[in-house]
A protein has these predicted regions:
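Active/binding-pocket-proximal capping segment
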Residues: 102-104, 126-127
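Membrane-interface junctions at the ends of membrane-embedded or membrane-associated helices
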Residues: 87-95, 132-156
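Hydrophobic/aromatic residues in alpha-helical transmembrane segments
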Residues: 79-83, 105, 132
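Membrane-proximal low-complexity regions enriched in glycine and acidic/polar residues
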Residues: 1-23
Length: 156
């Protein structure tokens, strides 16, 4: 009954629905640490931890900031590489080469409509690693091809 009421509310309020799903996707798929520090939140005597650990767990701590930036760069590289895969390898991959993509898309859709936390979705994110690697390989091959064509044009 609650589900039916929620669906009805979403249907009657499309702006709210779009905002809800936008925020949900951002909090789950664009948070670069996948809540790895949030789930480590310390309840109790945090002063017992070494200063590095406190700095890592505390939002705004120097170690926390470094960790977040490194995770953000890595996440951006993986998403970017997966996009390059779509651009450069489109139509040249056998079906069995897409199994991780199917799992990722299935996980994305499942958590779009079900409970979601970054810590639940990191396993799907990791499915993008082979595509990111291949995507960067496709991009490098394309760049080399472009440079080779320019070099040939200068020699002629």
């Amino acid at each position: 009954r609650d589900l039916a009421m929620t669906v009805q509310y979403f249907l009657e309020h499309p702006d709210y629905t779009a905002d809800f799903f936008e925020k949900k996707i951002q909090s789950v798929w664009a948070e670069p640490t996948f809540q790895s520090l949030w789930i480590q939140e310390v309840k109790g005597p945090g002063w017992l931890f070494p200063s590095f650990t406190r700095s890592l767990f505390r939002e705004g701590g120097w170690a926390n900031e470094i960790y977040w930036e490194l995770c953000n760069a890595l996440q951006s590289l993986i998403y970017g590489g997966a996009l390059l895969f779509v651009i450069f390898k489109r139509g040249r991959v056998r079906f069995e080469g897409l199994i991780f993509a199917v799992i990722f898309i299935g996980g994305f859709l499942f958590h779009l409509f079900w409970e979601a936390k970054g810590q639940y979705t990191v396993c799907y994110f990791l499915m993008l690693l082979p595509y990111a690697w291949s995507g960067f390989g496709g991009w490098i091959a394309w760049v080399n091809e472009q440079l080779g064509d320019r070099a040939k044009g200068r020699k002629a």
